[in-house]
């Protein structure tokens, strides 16, 4: 049978298909094949109408998945016949339609591409040293989108009218900036300026002034892609110390920005995973193991007393221009691959605990007394996005914080269901929205102990829902009723008349790992973190669970230790060590071992009387107790400092470890014998290695027994303690050796930043989980 000379088809592309150069890509492919038709953004994705010979239509569908733009991700193609009588004169990019038939993913921001860098450093190019250069393959996306479909009028560039040259590029199908929505140049784009501490705008080149301030040891506030950064010379001990003092951040490690991997070579070990993460379009902060020379080459205050360093490369043209200026403004990009002397501390511009600042006026007000110079511009940041953080320390990279370049993080789910709004936890808060078989995890909001972060959570819920066009049908939150996120969830559910699903903390941790792996079948779950409220009202932090569609069943926990002074023990690890000594019958040693700690005698009496010493199975507090016994933790200056210092002491693990644990009849794993051994050790490295080695072996045996009892052989791991590389990689290897399959979330954070995904998945797995209308 002869084929018709002409046929028509309509394709709907779903996935990351807007803001990534998909329409220009479709235009080029269609015109190269002689097809007529049009392509347009819609609220559901990208719609393509094609008319032409059947062979050419088939060739288009065959080639499209292999010729996608670098930032695109194609999840599905919906195909239907073109309406009869449809005619086209050539192929065109048509005006967008704001229809909402399916959730559309807002694209994350992307680091500067090589082609834009070539132009940025070419003195003969009209965008030479233009701090807002971008194209369809790179630049800001999520941070400047007001709403979808993704068009210039829906972004913070709407007020910048294109000059004739930019308009020509924008309309030229052969140009890299064909329909690049944030397109800009020195003639028509945003403007950069410098202001001093008095708010006076300074004359001269802003980049030159900024670099001069850094060279003088001053602190620079610069408006980045998703928020402001504070920067100083990472080799200048005085500047780093002053930044710590002004920011009220006494010890928490700072991130380091270098021009390229060659500039990091002497400081950190660059493995394949680390290089890929550093140089990828997300350009996150990457945790890399320090080389011995790092502490001599950097100011002592950059990342004190830790075995790793958080490093990143310039991700925006503005950051790149600081390094270009320091190199003497060379022509071309050859210098950009060579080692450069400039190393910068680059940290979020906020007071510790508060969200990053996004607006110029807010920066002037809130950073007064912190920054010496402000590098500002007038491209508004509509959606705050802190830097993403990725660990490249272990066998495979994993996300610690999802932000700029990664978020909103889209996770395909193994099944669909009602749309869920999940509010996450109190710490490292992020929210999750679902529609059908897709979940979107928001950028990191932060800790909800801060009022500004609480307001950021409220804005995130509104903005992400608006961008995705999702109206939640159910609300999920943590079981703890006093968390701000839980109170917000309760209020939201009441206002909208929606069912509320409180999900136990560790259940959510395990469900997040299941969601990422597309699992609806039962698994063993091992959750290790600081604490979560159990269904019985007790504080738990180390639990063995069976998690399935019908809910979460308790299988065992770490043997509880007393928390002298309650939550204060999480800030003073010596208290946990004192609690361990008391539990070992060695309370008489507390006063002498911790003579330098105020209140040591009072803590000993509290333990003797059992007053204000609630028991907790927290794995995080177990690490604190071990660190305290080894003299590594008096008072924590930031969260998990003692545990991080303990991990940093590990060079290798013992080949064989003594059985310094017990498993009782109630399946509680008791590690007091291990703590007793640590209490008598003076070698901190040997003690840290023994602690990790015994803990890994004990957890593996505990999980293997549960696997034998339940018949389940997949072990989902969750909770912030698994950010410990020694524990994570060691336990996974030991579980595999025992014939079990360990599962880890690597895209969603293992810590509380992934809780919202787990809460949403727990609700989707079991629509019959008992819920209340606005009551937790």
From Swiss-Prot:
Keywords: Ligase, Metal-binding, Zinc, Zinc-finger. InterPro entries: Acylphosphatase-like_dom, Acylphosphatase-like_dom_sf, Acylphosphatase_CS, Carbamoyltrans_HypF-like, Carbamoyltransferase_HypF, DHBP_synth_RibB-like_a/b_dom, HypF_C, HypF_C_2. Its EC number is 6.2.-.-. It catalyses: C-terminal L-cysteinyl-[HypE protein] + carbamoyl phosphate + ATP + H2O = C-terminal S-carboxamide-L-cysteinyl-[HypE protein] + AMP + phosphate + diphosphate + H(+). One of its GO terms (biological process) is protein maturation. Residues 8-95 form the Acylphosphatase-like domain. Pathway: Protein modification; [NiFe] hydrogenase maturation. The keyword Acyltransferase does not apply. Pfam families: Acylphosphatase (PF00708), HypF_C (PF17788), HypF_C_2 (PF22521), Sua5_yciO_yrdC (PF01300), zf-HYPF (PF07503). A zinc finger (C4-type) spans 113-138, 163-188. Residues 204-405 form the YrdC-like domain. The keyword Zinc-finger applies. One of its GO terms (molecular function) is zinc ion binding. NCBIfam families: hypF. Involved in the maturation of [NiFe] hydrogenases. Along with HypE, it catalyzes the synthesis of the CN ligands of the active site iron of [NiFe]-hydrogenases. HypF functions as a carbamoyl transferase using carbamoylphosphate as a substrate and transferring the carboxamido moiety in an ATP-dependent reaction to the thiolate of the C-terminal cysteine of HypE yielding a protein-S-carboxamide. Belongs to the carbamoyltransferase HypF family. This is Carbamoyltransferase HypF. It comes from Azotobacter vinelandii. The gene is hypF.
């Amino acid at each position: 049978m002869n084929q018709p000379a002409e046929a028509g088809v309509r394709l709907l592309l779903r996935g990351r298909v807007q803001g990534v150069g998909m329409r220009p890509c479709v235009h080029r492919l269609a015109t190269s094949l002689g097809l007529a038709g049009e392509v347009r953004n819609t609220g559901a994705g990208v719609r393509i109408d094609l008319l032409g010979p059947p062979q050419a239509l088939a060739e288009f569908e065959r080639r499209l998945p292999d010729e996608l733009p670098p930032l695109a991700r194609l999840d599905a193609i919906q195909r239907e016949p073109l309406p009869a009588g449809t005619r086209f004169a050539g192929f065109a990019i048509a005006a967008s339609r704001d229809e909402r038939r399916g959730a559309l993913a807002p694209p994350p921001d992307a680091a500067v591409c090589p082609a834009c860098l070539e132009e940025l450093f070419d003195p003969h190019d009209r965008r030479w040293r233009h701090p807002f250069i971008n194209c369809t393959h790179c630049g800001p996306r999520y941070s400047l989108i007001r709403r979808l479909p993704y068009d210039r009028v829906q972004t913070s560039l709407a007020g910048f009218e294109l000059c004739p040259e930019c308009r020509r590029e924008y309309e030229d199908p052969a140009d890299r900036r064909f329909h690049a929505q944030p397109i800009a140049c020195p003639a028509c784009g945003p403007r950069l300026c410098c202001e001093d501490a008095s708010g006076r705008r300074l004359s001269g080149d802003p980049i030159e002034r900024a670099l001069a301030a850094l060279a003088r040891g001053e602190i620079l506030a610069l408006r980045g892609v998703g928020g402001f950064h504070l920067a100083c010379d990472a080799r200048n001990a005085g500047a780093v110390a002053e930044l710590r003092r002004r920011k009220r951040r006494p010890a928490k490690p700072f991130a380091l920005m270098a021009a390229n991997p060659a500039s990091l070579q002497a400081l950190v070990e660059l493995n394949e995973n680390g290089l890929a993460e550093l140089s990828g379009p997300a350009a996150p902060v990457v945790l890399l193991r320090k080389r011995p020379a790092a502490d001599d080459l950097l100011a002592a205050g950059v990342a004190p007393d830790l075995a790793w360093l958080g490093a990143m490369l310039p991700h925006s043209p503005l950051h790149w221009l600081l390094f270009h200026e320091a190199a003497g403004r060379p022509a071309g990009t050859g210098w950009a691959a060579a080692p450069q002397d400039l190393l910068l501390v680059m940290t979020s511009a906020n007071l510790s605990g508060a969200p990053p600042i996004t607006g110029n006026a807010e920066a002037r007000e809130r950073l007064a007394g912190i920054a010496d110079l402000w590098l500002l511009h007038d491209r508004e940041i509509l959606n705050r996005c802190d830097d993403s953080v990725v660990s490249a320390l272990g066998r495979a990279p994993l996300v610690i914080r999802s932000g700029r370049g990664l978020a909103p993080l889209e996770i395909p789910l193994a099944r669909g269901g009602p749309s869920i709004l999940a509010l996450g936890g109190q710490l490292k808060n992020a929210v999750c929205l679902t529609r059908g078989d897709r979940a979107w995890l928001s950028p990191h909001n932060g800790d909800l102990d801060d009022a500004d972060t609480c307001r950021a959570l409220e804005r995130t819920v509104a903005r992400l829902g608006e961008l995705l066009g999702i109206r939640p049908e159910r609300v999920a939150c943590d079981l703890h009723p006093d968390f701000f996120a839980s109170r917000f969830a309760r209020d939201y559910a009441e206002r909208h008349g929606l069912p509320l699903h409180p999900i136990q903390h560790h259940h959510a941790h395990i469900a997040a790992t299941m969601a990422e792996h597309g699992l609806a079948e039962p698994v063993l779950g091992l959750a290790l973190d600081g604490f979560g409220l159990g269904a019985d009202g007790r504080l738990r932090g180390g639990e063995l669970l069976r998690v399935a569609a019908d809910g979460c069943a308790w299988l065992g926990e770490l043997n509880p230790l007393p928390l002298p002074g309650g939550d204060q023990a999480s800030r003073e690890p010596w208290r946990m060590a004192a609690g361990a000594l008391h539990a070992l019958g060695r309370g008489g040693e507390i006063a002498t071992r911790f003579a330098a700690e105020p209140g040591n005698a009072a803590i000993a009496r509290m333990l003797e009387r059992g007053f204000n010493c609630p028991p907790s199975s927290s794995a995080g507090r177990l690490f604190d107790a071990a660190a305290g016994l080894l003299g590594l933790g008096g008072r924590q200056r930031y969260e998990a400092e003692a545990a991080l210092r303990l991990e940093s002491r590990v060079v290798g693990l013992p080949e064989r470890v003594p059985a310094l644990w017990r498993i009782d009849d109630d399946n509680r794993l008791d590690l007091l014998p291990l703590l007793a051994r640590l209490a008598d050790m003076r070698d901190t490295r040997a003690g840290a290695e023994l602690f990790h080695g015994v803990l890994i072996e004990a957890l593996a045996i505990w999980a293997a027994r549960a696997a034998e009892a339940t018949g389940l052989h997949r072990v989902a791991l969750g909770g912030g303690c698994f950010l410990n590389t020694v524990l994570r990689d060691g336990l996974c290897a030991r579980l595999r050796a025992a014939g079990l399959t360990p599962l880890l979330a690597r895209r969603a954070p293992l810590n509380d930043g992934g809780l919202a995904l787990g809460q949403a998945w727990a609700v989707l797995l079991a629509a019959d989980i008992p819920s209340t209308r606005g009551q937790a």
